[in-house]
From Swiss-Prot:
Pfam families: Methyltransf_5
GO annotation, biological process: rRNA base methylation
Protein name per UniProt: Ribosomal RNA small subunit methyltransferase H
Gene: rsmH
Native source organism of the sequence: Nitrosospira multiformis (strain ATCC 25196 / NCIMB 11849 / C 71)
UniProt GO cellular component terms: cytoplasm
Keyword S-adenosyl-L-methionine: yes
């Protein structure tokens, strides 16, 4: 089993191998976390290789800055600013980018971060604790309609209406400031007979609030086109997602990028327009990869992981 408080990197070998590393290449780890993927990438890069890592979490950035490797640059920022940051660093194009989405084990297991429904802590849930509103602040001000929409859309929770109503009633009695308060409210709002086996009833609601507050899906949608724009021909995009909302975005993006049937019908086009519409920007590399039985047994959080890989083509 994974050690509590320690982040066990999911699909570590598979993800780094999927990057098809060149010793002198330039790579981006868009979600540094606790540096599992970055460490292995650096081990395999040559002396002239470079790795730029992004993370919104100040604690993660502190870990990265302790590396002491001149080939490595730690950036306190969302990967959704990838293109802007790389240009600031005078980097033209890159050989590969890795995105390991979601929340890390240390974030979940640090009670003060407020991500976990199983630990008593303040309702925070921010990836970047230096900016933005906390979960407690949002829960205090959101309308019942907004609560329902967020829980339904980002948590895919069929009892979103009942949960939203329960939150509004509860906050009228006292402020909602702790994870245990919210978890209890959600649990009480879901009929016992409708609860999913082996899943805490608060799972989907906590996921929804976290995704909404941190704009996780919006940032992913912003980042993917930037990744492709910055990749050299033959460069790899590797994305590990942990729930269907993320994976849907990644799968659709890669599929659309690989689609060569983009010519508008019955329209006269110039030669440059024909090239622009007919050329794919990506090709899929293999099938989706999931953790094996042994990895899931050692790290149950790996169970829902899905890795998709694409390669940049036709950059001219």
């Amino acid at each position: 089993m994974a050690e509590a408080g320690k982040h066990t990197t999911v699909l570590l070998q598979e993800a780094v191998e999927a990057l098809a590393l060149k010793p002198d290449g330039i790579y981006v780890d868009g979600t540094f976390g606790r540096g599992g993927h970055s460490r292995l990438i650096l081990e395999r890069l040559g002396k002239n290789g470079r790795l730029i890592a992004f993370d919104r979490d100040p604690v993660a950035c502190a870990v990265g800055r302790s590396f002491g490797d001149e080939r490595f640059c730690m950036v306190h920022s969302s990967y959704s600013r990838l293109q802007e940051v790389l240009r600031q660093l005078n980097i033209g194009q890159i050989d590969g980018v890795l995105l390991d989405l979601g929340v890390s084990s240390p974030q979940l297991e640090e009670a003060t971060r407020g991500f976990s429904f199983s630990m008593e802590g303040p309702l925070d849930m921010r990836m970047d604790t230096t900016e933005g509103q906390t979960a407690a602040q949002w829960l205090a001000s959101a309308s019942e309609v907004q609560l329902e929409e967020v829980i339904k859309e980002y948590g895919e929770e069929r009892f979103a209406k009942q949960i939203a109503r329960a939150i509004v009633k509860a906050r009228a009695r006292q402020p909602l400031v702790t994870t245990s308060q919210l978890a209890a409210i959600v649990a009480a709002a879901i009929p016992a007979r409708a609860r999913e086996p082996k899943q805490n009833p608060a799972t989907r609601t906590f996921q929804a609030i976290r995704i909404y507050l941190n704009q996780e899906l919006e940032r992913l949608s912003l980042a993917l086109p930037q990744c492709v724009e910055m990749l050299k021909t033959g460069g790899r995009l590797v994305v590990i997602s942990f729930h269907s909302l993320e994976d849907r975005i990644v799968k659709r993006f890669i599929r659309e990028g690989a689609n060569t049937d983009k010519l508008p019908k019955h329209l006269p086009l110039r030669a440059d327009e024909v090239r622009r519409f007919s050329r794919a920007s990506l090709q899929m590399v293999g099938k989706a990869v999931r953790p094996g039985v042994a990895e899931v047994e050692c790290n149950p959080r790996a169970r829902s992981a899905v890795m998709r890989v694409a390669e940049r083509i036709n950059t001219t």
